[in-house]
């Protein structure tokens, strides 16, 4: 928490704690957030697995397609549509994602990634459509969603497209889960 506070000191829009938690907790984790717990900045509940079979399976079906860095001047928070129905859909998709991973169910994992992408687009449309983004990022993502069981962007405005598939997309990298 001290590192998080130091990293975000004085920022109007602090970064989320998801990346920090991903570095600290081993294995595969589900992070649940609740606005009534520490203002929603830290998980209210964390569920993790280090099951070797699940880890090996996930490493075999998740592929990262590089997008490049965020463009200068990019701000995904310009438009915020905090519609409770979409927020619930995003939370449900996150829970379904973790359940699909633990069950080693590629189709369900793909569906959860696609649903997460749709929810993020509704809640924060500038993630995909911002004046500083070159090209049609949402269209690119839709192409991966149509060709593979599922896909979503790893971060706002840059990073990677995460693809769930038995076969690696061209130019993709594999992941490694730290246990």
Where are these regions (language model features)?
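DPxDG-like acidic metal-binding loop motif
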Residues: 1
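C-terminal nucleotide
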Residues: 4-14, 18-154, 162-179
